[in-house]
C-alpha cells in the first residue's frame, strides 16, 4: 500500500517514462520463458474461489491434509544458491528468443513488455488464449476497467502508473515492483493502495504441469503510465523459469518467487534487512495471527546500485491473510534446495500433557516451534491431539489459524490422545523416509517405544520437547531435548479474539392485538429461531427482535417479511417508524421536534458496522459504531431501507443535516442570555453522555436540549429560590469560547455547564453558562480526507528523539505513505508520538500490524485517532477538569476516576485519551496503580475547606457542587464597617490579626445565618465583628491563649456556612449553596471535603498533620513554624516535592479535610478543621468511656475522668469549640448516648443486648482470631489488614452483625482475654495477649523440636533454628524475658532443659495421656451431686483424694488446670461467678450424659436395649427426652454425641446401649457425696434417724463401698453386704421384673498373677466363719456406716457386733475394665466356674 509514494527504482531515469499519456505507445509484455510452448492453459473460472475454500477449519480435515493445499496460495519459493545451480546438468527444452540487458551478468535474459493504451478492456478469462506461444501480450492503461466487487464508488484519484504490484499480485510481475529495487526500464513508479473491500480474486490460468503462480484482483485502474519491465536472468538460470511445478524434480530449482526473477549478481550479494509488508499489496485482507519471520533475499537493484533500507524481505505468505504454506515460511528454506528436496519434519503435540499456559497465545507457541526446528526442513505434519470440548476454545481457534491439524479424541477413553499420536507417528514413518525429523511435544513415557523405533529402525532425528518431570526412559531416545517450561517462558498474552458484541434490532409491525403476547412471542420466535433472534419486547401491534449480527438480521428480515402471524401479514423493518422518532412538544423554538432518548436509539439502531468481505477494522470503530440516527432536530424516516449498509449511509447524512438544524436553533437563543454580563443564567440541564438520556422515563416524557434551554416553570422556580446567586463573572467576557460542536457532541443531547465553560483555569461556578460557538461548520467533511492520525504511547524515553523519529518513520513507512511524525515533549516520562498516514486504510494496516511492536526496550501502544475522538478531546478535557477539581488534591486513582467518569457521564472512558490531554492532566505510576492528577495550570485555587457535595450527599446520582472562587468582592461591608475608608490596594494582609472569641455555637449559628440573610448571602470576614455588633451585641473577644477560639474557625463550625476566598484575596463568609441550608440537611460539615482516597502519601501526611497539631496548644500553630515543628516532632524533613508539590502552601491546601488555614498574609495560622476535631473528640470520648467500669460518665465528673484517663487537664478549646455541649451534639446518637439519671446528665456508650447465639459465635470468633494471629509474624498484625486477612484465611467474610456488633473495634473489645489492640500513633496493631502468646510460642516450640533429630535442640541453636523455621526472629521481650533460659521456665509445661556434655539441651517433655485424665475428671464431675458446679480448686482436691496422686497440668502440656479444662469445651464449661474464683460445670449435653450414666448403673452390667431407652429414661428422670434440644435429630445421634460415656453395639432391634468401661467406676468418700439416687426407684434406705444410704436399685445384688481414708491409703476396702429391703422374703424368691434383662453372673477381675481362672482360693473361708445377718444387725450396720459417712470419721476395719472376713489383697483394687474401646474386652465364657461372685448376695444357711 505505497500510496502515491515515489520511489526511484533504478539508478537511471528514462525520458520515455515522462511522456504524456496520449503519446504513449503500446508495449508488449513478454512472459515467454515463464511457460512452455507445448503446455495448455486451463479455464480460469474453475479456480475462482479457491482461496475461500482454503479457509476451512483444520479440525474438519485433520487427517487428510492435501499435499498441495498450501502451494495454491502464493507459495514462498526460497531462493536457491547460484553455485549448486551451475553445477547441475539438465537437458534444456527449446525456448523462445530473448533479448539481452546490459545490467545482467549474463548475455541472455528474457524480456517482458507491458504496453499502455486507452479504452482497452481485458477479461480475466481470456488472458491466456494461445496454446502455441510463450508470449503473453497485455495492455495496461488508464482506460482499464476490471470487474470489481468493491462497494466503494469513488476511489481517490490516482496519478502516474496505477500500482502494478498491488493490482497484479498473482502475475509474474506481482512482486517485481515492490521487490525489485532495479527496474531499468521503469524509472519511477507510483504505488497505489487498493481501496474498498476485499476484491474477488481470479486465479491465473495454470498450465497442466505447473502450479498456478497466483491470483488476480479485479480492481479499477483510473490512471497509469507507460512502463516496460525488463527482467534479467543469467543464461544458466534460464531453465528455472520453464516450470514452477514442484513435481518436476528433473527441472533445475526455480529462482522465481511468485513470478519474480533475479540476476546472479544480486543473488550473490549479501542479504539486507528489508521488508515489504503484505498490506501494501493486499491491503484489505486481514493478516492471520501467525507471523513468520522474514529471510532477507537480495533483489535485483541494478548493477552497482545499492538498495534502500526500508524493505525487509520478499512477500510473506503469512501476512497475506491466507493460510501459511505447508512447508513453512520462506525463512525455513536453505539456499540451493527446493522444498521437495528438503527433509520432512513432523510435529506431534500432546497438548493435554504440555498445554498452553492460561491466558497465553498458542500462536506464539506454534511460531516458536516453527522458528526453532523448521530451518532446513519442510513441514510435512503438524498435529495436536485433544478433546476440543474440554480445551479452551480460543486455543483451538488459534491453532486452526496457524494451520495446525487439531485431532479430536474422546477424553473419557483411557490414553486416547496417546494412542492417536502414536498412530500418527507410525503413519509418518510409513509415509516418509530418512532423513526426516520428528518433534514430539509431550512428557508421557508411553511414547518411548515409538521414539525408539523411529530413531533406531527408521533413522529419524528425534527432538523431544518435554517438561521437567520427564522419565529417563523417554529422554533416552531423543537426539535433542528441549525443556517445555523454558521454551514457553516468556510467551506474550493472548489477545482477545472475540469481536465486540454488536447487536442488530428488527422492528415488526402489524401484529394482531387480539392474541396474548405470549402466543405472539412464540410465533415470532419460531419465525426467527433459525437466525438466532430473540424477542425483546411486544407492545401493542409492534415488537422488537434482537440478532447477534448483521447477516442474521438480514436473513431474518427476508424470512419474516409478509409472514402470517395469526391472520395478520407482518411488516419487518430495520428502523422504527417515523412517529416513534419524531414526537414533538410545544417549545419556544420554532421547528424543534421531540428527539428520542439517545439510549433508546442506541438500543434500537446499534449497528454492527463490519465489512462482509473481511476488510480490516480500526479500533476506533468499536466505540463509534451505532451512535444512533438522530441528532438535535428532525429525523428523516428511512424509506425502502433494504440493508444495513444503506442505513449506515443514511445515518451519516442525517447527522450532517441535523447538525445544521441544531445550529439554526442555537442561533434563536435570546442574545441577552450571553451578552449581558450581570444577568445570571440558570439552566437546569442534566449532564448525560452518549447512550444516556436526559430523563430516564418513557420517551413521551423526555425533553430535548432545546426544551431545557427554555424558560420553563422549573427554571423559574429555581431562579426564584436562588436569591443570592453569584453574578456572571466578568472574567468570562475576556475569554473566547471557540469550541466547535462536533456531530458526536450534538447527538449527545447534553449541555454540561462544566464541559462548556471556557474558564478551565478556574473553578467553574455552580451556575450554568452555555457558551456556544455559532460558527461551527455545518457541512462536516470526511474526517480522514487529509489523512489519518495514529497515536503512539508507551515509547521508550531512553532513546534519543532523533533515533525515535527515524525509527518510527521507517517502521510506519512499510505500511504506507507517512506524512509526518511528531514527538511530544518529555513530560513525566510519558513520551508520545503522532504519525500521520496518507489514508485510513494504511493507518488501519499499521495499527493492526504494529500494536505492541517493540521499539527499544518497550512495546508501543498504537491506536487510531479518529476524527470524532480528536474533536471530543476538548469535551473530555473539561469533563476531566470537572471531576479532578472536586477531588482532594486534584488527584484520583485511575480506577476511581474511571468509575466516577462512567457513572457521571454514562459512557465508556478510553484511558488512552487521557494520555492525550498533556496540557490538562498528568498520569503518574504510584504504588500499585496509576494516579490521574490535574496539572497546576488547570487547577483552581483551593479554598481552605475544599469542595462540597450536594446536600443529599449522593455523588453518584448528581454532580458534586464545586466551590466557585469569587471574582471580586469588597474587602469590608460598606454598611456596617466602622473604618469605611479601607482602600483595597493599600490594605496590608500582614496587619490583620485573627480575633479569638468565646461563643456558644447553639446561639452563634442562627446569628450567622441571620447576618447572611441581611447581607444578601455574603459578609466580608474583615468586617464580620462590626456587622455582628450592629445586629447583635458585642463579640466577647479574648487574647490568644486565654481560652478563646479563632472566630474564623467558629464560623466554619456553623452548618451550611463556608468561608471562600475571592480572586483579590479577600475572605468572604457565604452559604455553601448560595442559599440557607434546608432544615433536614445532614450535618453539612461532614460533606464539605473528602479524604484523598487512593493517594497514600496525602493520607499519611494528613495523619501526620493531625498528630502534630494535637501536641500544640489549642491545636494551633503558625504557618512559619510548621516546618521546624514537623522536623522536631517526627525527626524527619517535610519535603514538599515528595507529595508532588513545589510550595508548602499548595501541600497544606491539598488536605482541606483535616487542615484549616486561618487569617491572611504571613501571619496565617494552621488548625484542625471542625470535622477532624469532632472525629478526634469522638475517639477520645470513647476511650474515656471504655476505661470506666460502668462504660459511662456523669457530666459533672467528666473533668476528673478526663484527667485520670489522659493525664492532662480538660480544655474544651483543644477541640475547637467553647462549650462541651457544642461538640457532643455533633456526635451521632449511634456512637454516644446522653441520658438523664437521678437529675444528672450521663454520657454512655449505647449498648445492645446480644443474644446467646451471638455470644457463642463471639467465643468461636476468639478462637479464629487466635488461629489467624498465630500465622502472623510475632503474633500481631495491623488493624487495617484484619478483614482481608480473615477473608483470605477462612474463605468467608467477617460479618459484624453475626456477632451482634456494628464496629470491628467493639468486637475486638469483646474478646479481651485473647486479643489486645495497641495504638501506635494513628495506626492500630492487633496482638495476642501474653497468655495466648505463650501458648502460641509453645506450639511453635513443639513443632520446632519435633522436626529435629531425637526431638531435642541445643539451647545455643534455638534462636537461629527458630528464625530459619518460621521466617522471623524470636523477640524475647515480647514475653517479658531477657534470656532463653528464662523463656524456658515459662514453657516448662512443654519443654525441659537437660544438661549434656555438649551443653544445655532443650527437649520435649513426655506428656501423660490426656484422654485418661479426661475420663477421670468426667467421672468425678458426674459423681458430684452437690450444686451444679464446683470450683476448679475443689475438683483438683477431689481428684487427688480419690486417685491418691497429685494433678500437675504441666504433665499434660498446660500451664494451669483451668487451661486444661478450657481445652475440653464440649465436656465442661469454665466460668467465674462474679468473683475471681473459677468454677467448672458440665455442659448441657454432658448433663444428659450424667443422667444416662446414672440410669445405666441401675441395670445389669450397665446396658439396656436401645428401643427401651426412651421409656426407661423418662421413668428415671421424670421428663420426656427431646434430642433436638441438644442439637440432634434422633436418639441414636444424641447417644453418639457422648462417646466418652456410652456406645451402641449390635444391629437392628437388638442394639444395646452400653456404658463405657471408664464410666462404670463409682466413688464414695466421706467428703464426696454419693450420686445416682432417685426417689421413685426405691434406691434409698431410710432409717429411723433419717440417714440415707445409697443402694443400687432394680438389681439382684447390692454393694456398698466405703472410701479409703486419706490417712490410710494402703488399707484394704471393707465391703458390707446387706439385703436391699427389710422384707424377710429373699429377693431370689421374688419374681424377676419384666423390664429387667436376664441376670448374668460376672466374676470380679482377677489379678494378673492368677494364671488359672478355675482354681479355687488357697485358703477358702470355712462355713463356720460365715454367719447370717439378722434384720437387727443389718440395721446397725447401716446406721454405723451412715454415721461414719456424715461425720467424716475414718471407717474401722471391723464393725460392731459384726464379723467381716478380711478380703484378699487382690480385691482391694477397683473394678477395672479395659480403658480402650469395648472391642478389646475379653470374650465371656458361657460357663464360668469357681469364681468370686462378689455381686451375688451371700447367704449362710
From Swiss-Prot:
> Has the keyword Phosphoprotein been applied to this entry?
no
What residue ranges are annotated as transmembrane?
none
> What InterPro entries does the database record attribute to this sequence?
LOTUS-like, Marf1, MARF1_LOTUS, MARF1_RRM1, MARF1_RRM2, Nucleotide-bd_a/b_plait_sf, NYN, OST-HTH/LOTUS_dom
Under SUPFAM superfamilies, the record lists: RNA-binding domain, RBD
Task: State the GO CC annotations.
Answer: cytoplasm; peroxisome
Q: Where in the cell is it found?
A: Peroxisome
Q: What is this protein called?
A: Meiosis regulator and mRNA stability factor 1
- From which organism does this entry originate? Gallus gallus
The uppermost taxa in this organism's lineage are: Eukaryota, Metazoa, Chordata, Craniata, Vertebrata
Its gene name is: MARF1
Amino acid at each position: 500500500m505505497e500510496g502515491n509514494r515515489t520511489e526511484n527504482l533504478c539508478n537511471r531515469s528514462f525520458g520515455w517514462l515522462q511522456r504524456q499519456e496520449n503519446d504513449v505507445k503500446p508495449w508488449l509484455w513478454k512472459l515467454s520463458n515463464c511457460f512452455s510452448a507445448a503446455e495448455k492453459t486451463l479455464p480460469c473460472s474453475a479456480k475462482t474461489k479457491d482461496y475461500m475454500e482454503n479457509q476451512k477449519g483444520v479440525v474438519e480435515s485433520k487427517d487428510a491434509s492435501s499435499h498441495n493445499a498450501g502451494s495454491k496460495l502464493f507459495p514462498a519459493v526460497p531462493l536457491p544458491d547460484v553455485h549448486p545451480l551451475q553445477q547441475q546438468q539438465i537437458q534444456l527444452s527449446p525456448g523462445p528468443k530473448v533479448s539481452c540487458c546490459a545490467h545482467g551478468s549474463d548475455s541472455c535474459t528474457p524480456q517482458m513488455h507491458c504496453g499502455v493504451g486507452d479504452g482497452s478492456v481485458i477479461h480475466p478469462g481470456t488472458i491466456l488464449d494461445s496454446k502455441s506461444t510463450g508470449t503473453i501480450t497485455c495492455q495496461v492503461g488508464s482506460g482499464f476497467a476490471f470487474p470489481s466487487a468493491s462497494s466503494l464508488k469513488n476511489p481517490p484519484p490516482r496519478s502516474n502508473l496505477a500500482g502494478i504490484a498491488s493490482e497484479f499480485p498473482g502475475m509474474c510481475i506481482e512482486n517485481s515492483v515492490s521487490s525489485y529495487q532495479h527496474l531499468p526500464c521503469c524509472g519511477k513508479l507510483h504505488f497505489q493502495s487498493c481501496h474498498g473491500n476485499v476484491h474477488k480474486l481470479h486465479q491465473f490460468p495454470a498450465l497442466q504441469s505447473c502450479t498456478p503462480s497466483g491470483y488476480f484482483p479485479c480492481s479499477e485502474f483510473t490512471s497509469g503510465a507507460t512502463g516496460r519491465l525488463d527482467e534479467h536472468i543469467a543464461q544458466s538460470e534460464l531453465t528455472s523459469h520453464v516450470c514452477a511445478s514442484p513435481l518436476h524434480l528433473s527441472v533445475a530449482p526455480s529462482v522465481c518467487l511468485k513470478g519474480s526473477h533475479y540476476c546472479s549478481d544480486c543473488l550473490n550479494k549479501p542479504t539486507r534487512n528489508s521488508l515489504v509488508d503484505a498490506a501494501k499489496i493486499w491491503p484489505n485482507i486481514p493478516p492471520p495471527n501467525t507471523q513468520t519471520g522474514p529471510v532477507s533475499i537480495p533483489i535485483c537493484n541494478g548493477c552497482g546500485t545499492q538498495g534502500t533500507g526500508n524493505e525487509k524481505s520478499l512477500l510473506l505468505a503469512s501476512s497475506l491473510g491466507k493460510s501459511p504454506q505447508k512447508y513453512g515460511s520462506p525463512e525455513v528454506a536453505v539456499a540451493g534446495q527446493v522444498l521437495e528436496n528438503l527433509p520432512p519434519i513432523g510435529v506431534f503435540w500432546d497438548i493435554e500433557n504440555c498445554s498452553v499456559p492460561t491466558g497465553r497465545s498458542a500462536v506464539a507457541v506454534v511460531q516458536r516451534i516453527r522458528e526453532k526446528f523448521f530451518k532446513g526442513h519442510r513441514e510435512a505434519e503438524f498435529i495436536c491431539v485433544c478433546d476440543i470440548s474440554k480445551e479452551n476454545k480460543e486455543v483451538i481457534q488459534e491453532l486452526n489459524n496457524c494451520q495446525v491439524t487439531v485431532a479430536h479424541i474422546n477424553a473419557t477413553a483411557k490414553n486416547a490422545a496417546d494412542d492417536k499420536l502414536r498412530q500418527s507417528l507410525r503413519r509418518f514413518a510409513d509415509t516418509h523416509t530418512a532423513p526426516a525429523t520428528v518433534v514430539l511435544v509431550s512428557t508421557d513415557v508411553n511414547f518411548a517405544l515409538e521414539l525408539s523405533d523411529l530413531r533406531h529402525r527408521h533413522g529419524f532425528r528425534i527432538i523431544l520437547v518435554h517438561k521437567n518431570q520427564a522419565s529417563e526412559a523417554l529422554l533416552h531416545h531423543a537426539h535433542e531435548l528441549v525443556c517445555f517450561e523454558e521454551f514457553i517462558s516468556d510467551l506474550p498474552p493472548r489477545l482477545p479474539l472475540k469481536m465486540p458484541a454488536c447487536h442488530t434490532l428488527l422492528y415488526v409491525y402489524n401484529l394482531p392485538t387480539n392474541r396474548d403476547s405470549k402466543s405472539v412471542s412464540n410465533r415470532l420466535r419460531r419465525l426467527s429461531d433459525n437466525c438466532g433472534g430473540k424477542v425483546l419486547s411486544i407492545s401493542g401491534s409492534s415488537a422488537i427482535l434482537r440478532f447477534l449480527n448483521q447477516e442474521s438480521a438480514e436473513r431474518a428480515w427476508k424470512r419474516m417479511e409478509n409472514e402470517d402471524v395469526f391472520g395478520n401479514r407482518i411488516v419487518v423493518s430495520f428502523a422504527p417508524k417515523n412517529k416513534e422518532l419524531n414526537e414533538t412538544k410545544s417549545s419556544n423554538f420554532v421547528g424543534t421536534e421531540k428527539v428520542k432518548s439517545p439510549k433508546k436509539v442506541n438500543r434500537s439502531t446499534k449497528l454492527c458496522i463490519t465489512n462482509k468481505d473481511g476488510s480490516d477494522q480500526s479500533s476506533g470503530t468499536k466505540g463509534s459504531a451505532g451512535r444512533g440516527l438522530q441528532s438535535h432536530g428532525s429525523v428523516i424516516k428511512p424509506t425502502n431501507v433494504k440493508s444495513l449498509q444503506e442505513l449506515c449511509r443514511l445515518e451519516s447524512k442525517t447527522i450532517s443535516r441535523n447538525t445544521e438544524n441544531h445550529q439554526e436553533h442555537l442561533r434563536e437563543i435570546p442574545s441577552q442570555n450571553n451578552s449581558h454580563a450581570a444577568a445570571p443564567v440558570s439552566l437546569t440541564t442534566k449532564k448525560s453522555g452518549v447512550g444516556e438520556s436526559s430523563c430516564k422515563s418513557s420517551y413521551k416524557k423526555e425533553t430535548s436540549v432545546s426544551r431545557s434551554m427554555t424558560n420553563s416553570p422549573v427554571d423559574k422556580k429555581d431562579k426564584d429560590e436562588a436569591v443570592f446567586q453569584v453574578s456572571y463573572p466578568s472574567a468570562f467576557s475576556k475569554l473566547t469560547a471557540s469550541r466547535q460542536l462536533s456531530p458526536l457532541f450534538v447527538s449527545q443531547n447534553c449541555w454540561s455547564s462544566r464541559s462548556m465553560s471556557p474558564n478551565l483555569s478556574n473553578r467553574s461556578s455552580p451556575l450554568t453558562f452555555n457558551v456556544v460557538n455559532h460558527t461551527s461548520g455545518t457541512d462536516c467533511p470526511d474526517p480522514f480526507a487529509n489523512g489519518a492520525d495514529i497515536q503512539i504511547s508507551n515509547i521508550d524515553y531512553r532513546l534519543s528523539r532523533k533515533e525515535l523519529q527515524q525509527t518510527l518513520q521507517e517502521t510506519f513507512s512499510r505500511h504506507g505513505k507517512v506524512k509526518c511524525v511528531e514527538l511530544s515533549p518529555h513530560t513525566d516520562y510519558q513520551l508520545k508520538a503522532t504519525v500521520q498516514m496518507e489514508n485510513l486504510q494504511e493507518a488501519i494496516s499499521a495499527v493492526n500490524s504494529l500494536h505492541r511492536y517493540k521499539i527499544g526496550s518497550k512495546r508501543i501502544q498504537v491506536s487510531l485517532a479518529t476524527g470524532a475522538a480528536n474533536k471530543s478531546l476538548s469535551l473530555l478535557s473539561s469533563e476531566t477538569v470537572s471531576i479532578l477539581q472536586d477531588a482532594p488534591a486534584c488527584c484520583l486513582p485511575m480506577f476511581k476516576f474511571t468509575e466516577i467518569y462512567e457513572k457521571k457521564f454514562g459512557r465508556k472512558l478510553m484511558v488512552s485519551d487521557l494520555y492525550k490531554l498533556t496540557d490538562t492532566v498528568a498520569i503518574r505510576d504510584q504504588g500499585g496503580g496509576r494516579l490521574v492528577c490535574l496539572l497546576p495550570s488547570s487547577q483552581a485555587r483551593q479554598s481552605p475547606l475544599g469542595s462540597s457535595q450536594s446536600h443529599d450527599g449522593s455523588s453518584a446520582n448528581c454532580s458534586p457542587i464545586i466551590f466557585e472562587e469569587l471574582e471580586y468582592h469588597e474587602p469590608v461591608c460598606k454598611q456596617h464597617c466602622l473604618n469605611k475608608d479601607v482602600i483595597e490596594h493599600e490594605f496590608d494582609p500582614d496587619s490583620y490579626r485573627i480575633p479569638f472569641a468565646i461563643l456558644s455555637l447553639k446561639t452563634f449559628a442562627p446569628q450567622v445565618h441571620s447576618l447572611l440573610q441581611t447581607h444578601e448571602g455574603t459578609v466580608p470576614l474583615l468586617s464580620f465583628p462590626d456587622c455582628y455588633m450592629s445586629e447583635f451585641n458585642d463579640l466577647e473577644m479574648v487574647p490568644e491563649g486565654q481560652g478563646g477560639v479563632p472566630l474564623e474557625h467558629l464560623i466554619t463550625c456553623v452548618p451550611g456556612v463556608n468561608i471562600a476566598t475571592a480572586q483579590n484575596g479577600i475572605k468572604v463568609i457565604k452559604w455553601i449553596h448560595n442559599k440557607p441550608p434546608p432544615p433536614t440537611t445532614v450535618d453539612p460539615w461532614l460533606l464539605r471535603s473528602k479524604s484523598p482516597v487512593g493517594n497514600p502519601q496525602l493520607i499519611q501526611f494528613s495523619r501526620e498533620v493531625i498528630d502534630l497539631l494535637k501536641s500544640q496548644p489549642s491545636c494551633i500553630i503558625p504557618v512559619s513554624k510548621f516546618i521546624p515543628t514537623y522536623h522536631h516532632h517526627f525527626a524527619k524533613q517535610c519535603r514538599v516535592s515528595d507529595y508532588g508539590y513545589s510550595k508548602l502552601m499548595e501541600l497544606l491546601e491539598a488536605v482541606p479535610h483535616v487542615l484549616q488555614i486561618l487569617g491572611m498574609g504571613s501571619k496565617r495560622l494552621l488548625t484542625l478543621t471542625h470535622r477532624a476535631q469532632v472525629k478526634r473528640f469522638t475517639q477520645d470520648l470513647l476511650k474515656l468511656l471504655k476505661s470506666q467500669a460502668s462504660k459511662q460518665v456523669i457530666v459533672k465528673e467528666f473533668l476528673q475522668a478526663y484527667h485520670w484517663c489522659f493525664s492532662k487537664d480538660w480544655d474544651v478549646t483543644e477541640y475547637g469549640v467553647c462549650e462541651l455541649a457544642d461538640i457532643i451534639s455533633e456526635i451521632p446518637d449511634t456512637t454516644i448516648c446522653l441520658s438523664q439519671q437521678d437529675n444528672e446528665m450521663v454520657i454512655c456508650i449505647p449498648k445492645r443486648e446480644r443474644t446467646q447465639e451471638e455470644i457463642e459465635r463471639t467465643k468461636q470468633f476468639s478462637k479464629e482470631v487466635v488461629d489467624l494471629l498465630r500465622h502472623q509474624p510475632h503474633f500481631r498484625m495491623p488493624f487495617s489488614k484484619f478483614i482481608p486477612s480473615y477473608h483470605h484465611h477462612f474463605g468467608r467474610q467477617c460479618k459484624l452483625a453475626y456477632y451482634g456488633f456494628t464496629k470491628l473495634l467493639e468486637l475486638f473489645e469483646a474478646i479481651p482475654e485473647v486479643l489486645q489492640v495497641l495504638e501506635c500513633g494513628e495506626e492500630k496493631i492487633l496482638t495476642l495477649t501474653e497468655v495466648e502468646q505463650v501458648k502460641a510460642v509453645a506450639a511453635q516450640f513443639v513443632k520446632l523440636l519435633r522436626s529435629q533429630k531425637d526431638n531435642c535442640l541445643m539451647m545455643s541453636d534455638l534462636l537461629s533454628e527458630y528464625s530459619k523455621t518460621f521466617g522471623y526472629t524470636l523477640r524475647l521481650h515480647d514475653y517479658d524475658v531477657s534470656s532463653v533460659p528464662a523463656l524456658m521456665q515459662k514453657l516448662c509445661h512443654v519443654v525441659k532443659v537437660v544438661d549434656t556434655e555438649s551443653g544445655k539441651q532443650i527437649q520435649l517433655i513426655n506428656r501423660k495421656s490426656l484422654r485418661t485424665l479426661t475420663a477421670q475428671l468426667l467421672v468425678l464431675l458426674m459423681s458430684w451431686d452437690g450444686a451444679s458446679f464446683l470450683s476448679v480448686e475443689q475438683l483438683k482436691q477431689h481428684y487427688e483424694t480419690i486417685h491418691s496422686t497429685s494433678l500437675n497440668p504441666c504433665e499434660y502440656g498446660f500451664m494451669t488446670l483451668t487451661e486444661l479444662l478450657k481445652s475440653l469445651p464440649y465436656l465442661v464449661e469454665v466460668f467465674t461467678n462474679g468473683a475471681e474464683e473459677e468454677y467448672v460445670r458440665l455442659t448441657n449435653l454432658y448433663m444428659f450424659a450424667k443422667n444416662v450414666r446414672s440410669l445405666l448403673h441401675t441395670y445389669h452390667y450397665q446396658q439396656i436395649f436401645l428401643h427401651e431407652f426412651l421409656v426407661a429414661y423418662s421413668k428415671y428422670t421424670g421428663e420426656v427426652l427431646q434430642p433436638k434440644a441438644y442439637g440432634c435429630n434422633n436418639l441414636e445421634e444424641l447417644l453418639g454425641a457422648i462417646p466418652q460415656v456410652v456406645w451402641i453395639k449390635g444391629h437392628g432391634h437388638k442394639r444395646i446401649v452400653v456404658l463405657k468401661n471408664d464410666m462404670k467406676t463409682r466413688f464414695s468418700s466421706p467428703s464426696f457425696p454419693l450420686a445416682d439416687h432417685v426417689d421413685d426407684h426405691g434406691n434409698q434406705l431410710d432409717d429411723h434417724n433419717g440417714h440415707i444410704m445409697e443402694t443400687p436399685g432394680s438389681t439382684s445384688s447390692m454393694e456398698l463401698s466405703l472410701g479409703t481414708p486419706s490417712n490410710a491409703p494402703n488399707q484394704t476396702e471393707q465391703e458390707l453386704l446387706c439385703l436391699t429391703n427389710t422384707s424377710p422374703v429373699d429377693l431370689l424368691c421374688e419374681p424377676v421384673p419384666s423390664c429387667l434383662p436376664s441376670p448374668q453372673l460376672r466374676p470380679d477381675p482377677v489379678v494378673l498373677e492368677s494364671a488359672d481362672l478355675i482354681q479355687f482360693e488357697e485358703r477358702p473361708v470355712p462355713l463356720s466363719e460365715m454367719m447370717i445377718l439378722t434384720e437387727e444387725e443389718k440395721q446397725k450396720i447401716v446406721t454405723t456406716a451412715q454415721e461414719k459417712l456424715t461425720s467424716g470419721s475414718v471407717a474401722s476395719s471391723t464393725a460392731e457386733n459384726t464379723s467381716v472376713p478380711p478380703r484378699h489383697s487382690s480385691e482391694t483394687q477397683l473394678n477395672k475394665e479395659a480403658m480402650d474401646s469395648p472391642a478389646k474386652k475379653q470374650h465371656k465364657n458361657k460357663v464360668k466356674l469357681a469364681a468370686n461372685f462378689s455381686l451375688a448376695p451371700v447367704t449362710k444357711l
